[in-house]
């Protein structure tokens, strides 16, 4: 009874003040010692089988609680939002993984739980599931391996052509370049659309908003711009090439499939990446897709190359973000959007930039698309994006149904920095066109009230009608800049003033065919020089005059 003797010796060794200890406490120490002795004696007498069963009992009774710093448990799940207890070390916008294999992103870091948005079907997650940190902020694969592919918002291939071969990854939420690495916009980004390249020119590194009601041709302008880059990407000059990223947000899958087919038919997919977060995808994926596409574009920008990104459209991204924010219990503001919805778009669009030569001289041009309701450009999201961008192309339903396509309202459309990037040849021929069209619109409003107009006003109306006809252009038929210059030259210099407006389109097609087949050297000179010299001017005048004489006859 060694254990009992030790306990008694300890009790006797206590000083007299230990008398204050109750008899119960002293008794309990003797009971504990006796139980320990009995347990040891029983273990000695038992066989191997009983020892293993006792050990099994102790193992099963062990504390199975997990480390709450790196993992957590789902408290509630619904509407694509999971509330998770634990994950104390998780970072904002860190990727987390659920036990079902689904990924999510931590957005709300609260004292007692973490709000996680789920990238996928939340029905695969149930309460009590374990969630673990990945330690990585959300990133996507980037590089030239993605060209010609269709990927989702996380960079996973969804075109059935196998996995993406890229080994380079980049965070989706990178900070925009500062002031020092940037340089002012100076190189043209040609869309191939006469009305845009002549009146609202876009430069490489610019952010130009395409805004209008549904079904007014917003996506058509974006697709024409991508198709027009084929003439540069087929060449060998890397400085002229423009890689394209098209981000489809909240669109129908059939629409995206149709778009990919159109680009494939035009042989434009070889220099294009399509990032798709369709209407059936979870709201967090629709929110994330523009940032993922932007990171893919930044890869080209930061490697001294040029890229164009189209966000179609940011209205749907804002709606997805509003849905997430309200479900995360963030306070709503105007139109129920959260207070940081301006920052949502500004931090995205500020990443489009023209870098200076010390930083590679690359560029990322952004063409965000915004859908308005009944032409209301004073709504919350349209005004936000208009204030962030460097100009806007405003499309009108009324013009669209009048047959003026692209339905660009020349008065409301503006490019704040693009004129510095416009080629000199286009500046020379289109310089007065915007003013003439503005005067035409002003006079046309009064002309319907009376017919007794002076000769100068009648001349203004006549010229305006013909220029409006001249700016019409078919879908998926972008034009080279030198072809645009030749056509606009004929209209602005007054050679078409006596031609019937209904014959303008026919004249344009015939004139272009004639110039391309008979005067290729002149077009090459305009393209190479980038300006119209006196010699070129005289040659153009001669060609237009001679062709018109034959055309009218």
UniProtKB/Swiss-Prot annotation:
Origin superkingdom: Eukaryota
Extra facts: The siderophore enterobactin (Ent) produced by enteric bacteria binds Fe(3+) and helps bacteria scavenge iron ions from the environment. As a consequence, the mammalian siderocalin LCN2 plays an important role in defense against bacterial infections by sequestering iron bound to microbial siderophores. LCN2 can also bind iron bound to endogenous or nutrient-derived iron chelators and plays an important role in cellular iron homeostasis.
Pfam family, any one: ATP-synt_ab_C
Bilayer topology term: Peripheral membrane protein
Sugar attachment sites: 76
N6-succinyllysine modification, residue list: 161, 167, 230, 239, 261, 305, 427, 498, 506, 531, 539
Family: Belongs to the ATPase alpha/beta chains family.
Transit peptide stretch: 1-43
PANTHER family reported in the protein's UniProt record: ATP SYNTHASE SUBUNIT ALPHA, MITOCHONDRIAL (PTHR48082:SF2)
UniProt protein name: ATP synthase F(1) complex subunit alpha, mitochondrial
Site residues, Required for activity: 413
Stored InterPro entries: ATP_synth_asu-like_sf, ATP_synth_asu_C, ATP_synth_asu_C_sf, ATP_synth_F1_a_nt-bd_dom, ATP_synth_F1_asu, ATPase_a/bsu_AS, ATPase_F1/V1/A1_a/bsu_N, ATPase_F1/V1/A1_a/bsu_N_sf
